[in-house]
């Protein structure tokens, strides 16, 4: 383990505290709710869902936060403006910690930022995300909102290298004429969470993992990713699981995906990650112990270099 020479930013936001030197603060964990084909969703366009089941999932993640000391985020996904607004209104009623405003639709993200501002809970919200594809209209909308935290994606489709990821943050790289950090600052973002943009295995997954070190070493900013997507996009694993099912080993086929899915978060944590978007919130009881264990090993090692873990660190809670 190691310490960065660069002073490391610590983000304190909506009750969560993360960032800093490896071993200082536990990794923050973000579980996604209302994702595509989530069984609790009854109408994905209108945002109709089983409220009792949704609250139970959010409460279970909060319980895991209390047990391990790892801060929890709720990543709220909605495919339409109506759905995302309905979802975040509900989440703000049952959860007072950080929540991500997430959608594949820019219009939906804009509507969510506006609603959070209007309803007075923008101080809980993390925009997902500021990236090279963001339109001027969306950035202007974000600027006019009260949202002050955002995922900032360091991905340049023209240059997926580690240098390319740093360049897109600093000067826009080969795709934009403005760096993503400057764009975030212009949009009123005070709390940038750098996402190293993990791509599939064989197409730059390793570059993204290495970029986590580079971002912290060069910029001192909190980093993380949705690295759990790597196993989902792994063709070999898909075929391997198919073979297991054909052999009648359905449970092993499920288990091997879970092992790789949760294990991916350990990779990000070990490579100086400050937060992970671990996937379905349903997996909180799997993700939190795995990442907490990793945090404990990192913190115990980092003590020899003078890094003192905070009181609520898993190393102080789970031994």
UniProtKB/Swiss-Prot annotation:
Enzyme Commission (EC) number: 7.2.1.4
InterPro entries assigned: Dihydropteroate_synth-like_sf, MeTrfase_MtrH/MtxH, MtrH
Enzyme class: translocase
Catalytic activity line of the entry: 5-methyl-5,6,7,8-tetrahydromethanopterin + coenzyme M + 2 Na(+)(in) = 5,6,7,8-tetrahydromethanopterin + methyl-coenzyme M + 2 Na(+)(out)
Cysteines joined through disulfide linkages: none
Pathway(s) the chain acts in: One-carbon metabolism; methanogenesis from CO(2); methyl-coenzyme M from 5,10-methylene-5,6,7,8-tetrahydromethanopterin: step 2/2
Keyword set, alphabetical order: Methanogenesis, Methyltransferase, One-carbon metabolism, Transferase, Translocase
Domain of life: Archaea
Name of this chain's protein: Tetrahydromethanopterin S-methyltransferase subunit H
């Amino acid at each position: 383990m190691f310490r960065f020479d660069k002073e490391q930013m610590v983000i304190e936001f909506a009750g969560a505290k993360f960032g800093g030197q490896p071993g200082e603060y536990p990794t923050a964990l973000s579980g996604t709710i209302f994702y595509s084909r989530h069984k609790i969703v009854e109408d994905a366009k209108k945002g109709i869902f089983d409220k009792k089941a949704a609250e139970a999932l959010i409460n279970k993640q909060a319980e895991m936060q209390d047990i391990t000391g790892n801060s929890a985020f709720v990543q709220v996904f909605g495919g339409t403006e109506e759905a995302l607004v309905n979802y975040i209104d509900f989440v703000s009623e049952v959860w007072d910690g950080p929540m991500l405003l997430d959608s594949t639709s820019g219009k939906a993200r804009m509507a969510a930022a506006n609603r959070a501002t209007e309803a007075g809970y923008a101080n809980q919200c993390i925009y997902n995300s500021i990236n090279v594809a963001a339109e001027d209209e969306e950035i202007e909308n974000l600027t006019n909102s009260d949202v002050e935290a955002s995922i900032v994606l360091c991905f340049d489709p023209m240059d997926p290298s580690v240098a390319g990821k740093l360049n897109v943050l600093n000067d826009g790289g080969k795709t934009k004429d403005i760096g993503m950090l400057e764009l975030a600052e212009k949009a009123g973002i005070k709390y940038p969470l750098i996402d190293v943009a993990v791509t599939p295995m064989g197409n730059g997954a390793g570059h993204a993992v290495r970029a986590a070190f580079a971002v912290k070493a060069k910029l001192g900013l909190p980093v993380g990713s949705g690295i759990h997507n790597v196993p989902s996009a792994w063709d070999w694993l898909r075929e391997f699981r198919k073979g297991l099912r054909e052999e009648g080993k359905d449970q092993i086929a499920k288990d091997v995906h879970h092992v790789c899915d949760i294990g991916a978060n350990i990779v990000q944590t070990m490579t100086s990650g400050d937060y992970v978007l671990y996937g379905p919130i349903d997996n909180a009881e799997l993700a939190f112990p795995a990442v907490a264990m990793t945090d404990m090993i990192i913190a115990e090692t980092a003590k020899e270099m003078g890094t003192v873990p905070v009181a609520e660190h898993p190393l102080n809670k789970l031994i």
